[in-house]
């Protein structure tokens, strides 16, 4: 397989990333650095990701300035970067190629055996499980994941083999750049609708186009349990393997039970003469579906069942996906702390179900930070319904993610709607540190406390552990 460096290394030696700390950007930056490119990048604040990249030898700037790109022959941007960014403006003036993140990922994948995982929910976990199994099989893949693997503390690595595993992002339709050999569609849901002119059919059509990027001998592995996926099934004209709990699935999970913090089930797949058992070191039925997708990929790669079984039994998960942070001691009350990235009602529902199944007869106390005004507006009724099922709820202000406010869409109006819908009385706060003042008055002994959201709430578990352990 031709090395990417041989293709344009003579022309492109230094690559600059605008917004390098983004989950999709940092992984590509790390792989390119390990391929031998000079990598620089800018972001508005220092964090663990920028620290890691700096330790590797990347040049990191903590503000956006035109001088940051002085040595670059290409500038990589994510969809979050606006045209008025000074580095983008300077790149235009100097006629430096401006490369969308997904186009750079596609360039990496073009010279490898690509495995692309798409879907509204479950991409990161599914990608991580596939990566873990391939590593256990000693296939040494390159991988670029939107979350941090708990086992290694990283989200990207340059492998020695031709395999490249990556998430395929539908949020800005950039997954249409990717041309893989194998692909997964986990589900299709109403999310990032502005990209598709608020037309759900256009979103579904994009997933059909994603599947069409496979070669005629490629395979698309899809969840037959999902309504949105079923609606495009007849439009996919590539070999298909289906998975799910449904009796009609090619790969089906049966005999499901939870044992402590594991899911145990059997796999039926007609490639094998009899069912084989799985012990998954994660909780939640949604994670069984993610695992079925991963099994489909790994069976296509002829990975032995015993390796798949061993890998799933010791998979340690992904940061901020039902991440257990241990016990808190709040005024001598013992509280189990979990953290999750969930920010869509369907994701939140899956997390709630998983924790309630695991901690039956215990209260679920939730601290939720809504993410984006547009999402809160579009899914307001669904948020109201799902959040009402918590036993206690603290709402932080909406994390805007560069969006402008929408009239009457805020955490206070969401709290009012929840009060009207149910008997729950949410507490609304503007400052995370205020949680330390009110939490002792909310929790009971043996409660399960969940911090939830895709914004800066990710810093809250450490604050809680610092003060309550």
UniProtKB/Swiss-Prot annotation:
Localisation per UniProt entry: Cytoplasm
Keyword ATP-binding: yes
Main location (coarse class): cytoplasm
Catalysed reactions, semicolon-separated: UDP-N-acetyl-alpha-D-muramate + L-alanine + ATP = UDP-N-acetyl-alpha-D-muramoyl-L-alanine + ADP + phosphate + H(+)
Domain of life: Bacteria
Chain positions recorded as ATP binding sites: 119-125
Stored Pfam families: Mur_ligase (PF01225), Mur_ligase_C (PF02875), Mur_ligase_M (PF08245)
Its EC number(s): 6.3.2.8
A GO CC term assigned to this protein in UniProt: cytoplasm
MF GO annotations: ATP binding; UDP-N-acetylmuramate-L-alanine ligase activity
Leading EC class: ligase
Pathway the protein contributes to: Cell wall biogenesis; peptidoglycan biosynthesis
Family: Belongs to the MurCDEF family.
Primary role: Cell wall formation.
Name of the protein this chain belongs to: UDP-N-acetylmuramate--L-alanine ligase
Native source organism of the sequence: Vesicomyosocius okutanii subsp. Calyptogena okutanii (strain HA)
């Amino acid at each position: 397989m031709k090395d990417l460096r041989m293709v344009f290394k003579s022309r492109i030696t230094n690559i600059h990333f605008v917004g390098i700390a983004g989950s999709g950007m940092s992984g590509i930056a790390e792989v390119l650095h390990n391929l031998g490119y000079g990598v620089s990048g800018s972001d508005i604040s220092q964090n663990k990701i920028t620290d890691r990249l700096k330790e590797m030898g990347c040049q990191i700037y903590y503000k956006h300035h035109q001088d940051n790109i002085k040595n670059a022959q290409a500038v990589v941007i994510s969809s979050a970067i606006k045209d008025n960014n000074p580095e983008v403006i300077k790149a235009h003036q100097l006629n430096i190629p401006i490369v969308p993140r997904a186009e750079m990922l596609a360039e990496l994948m073009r010279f490898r055996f690509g495995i692309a995982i798409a879907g509204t929910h479950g991409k990161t976990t599914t990608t991580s499980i596939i990566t873990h199994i391939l590593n256990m099989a000693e296939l040494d893949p390159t991988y670029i994941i939107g979350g941090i693997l708990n086992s290694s503390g990283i989200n990207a690595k340059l492998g020695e083999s031709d395999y490249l595993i990556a998430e395929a992002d539908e949020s800005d339709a950039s997954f249409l750049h990717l041309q893989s050999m194998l692909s997964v569609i986990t589900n299709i849901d109403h999310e990032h609708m502005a990209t598709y002119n608020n037309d759900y059919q256009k979103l579904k059509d994009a997933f059909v186009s994603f599947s069409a990027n496979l070669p005629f001998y490629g395979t698309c592995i899809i969840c037959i349990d999902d309504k949105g996926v079923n609606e495009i099934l007849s439009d996919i004209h590539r070999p298909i393997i289906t998975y799910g709990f449904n009796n009609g699935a090619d790969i089906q999970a049966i005999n499901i039970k939870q044992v402590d913090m594991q899911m145990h089930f059997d796999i039926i797949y007609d490639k094998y003469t009899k069912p084989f058992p799985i012990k998954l070191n994660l909780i939640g039925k949604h994670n069984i579906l993610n695992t079925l997708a991963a099994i489909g990929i790994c069976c296509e790669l002829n990975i032995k069942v015993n390796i798949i079984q061993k890998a799933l039994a010791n998979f340690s998960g992904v940061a901020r996906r039902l991440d257990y942070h241990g016990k808190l001691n709040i005024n001598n009350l013992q509280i189990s702390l979990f953290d999750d990235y969930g920010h869509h009602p369907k994701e939140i529902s899956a997390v709630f179900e998983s924790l309630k199944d695991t901690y039956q007869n215990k209260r679920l106390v939730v601290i939720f930070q809504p993410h984006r005004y547009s999402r809160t507006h579009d899914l307001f009724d669904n948020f109201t319904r799902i959040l009402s099922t918590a036993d206690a709820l603290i709402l932080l202000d909406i994390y805007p993610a560069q969006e402008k406010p929408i009239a009457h869409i805020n955490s206070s109006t969401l709290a009012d709607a929840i009060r009207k819908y149910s008997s729950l009385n949410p507490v609304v706060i503007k400052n995370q540190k205020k949680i330390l003042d009110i939490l002792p008055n909310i929790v009971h002994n043996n409660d399960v406390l969940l911090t939830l959201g895709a914004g800066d709430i990710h810093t809250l578990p450490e604050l809680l552990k610092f003060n309550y352990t």
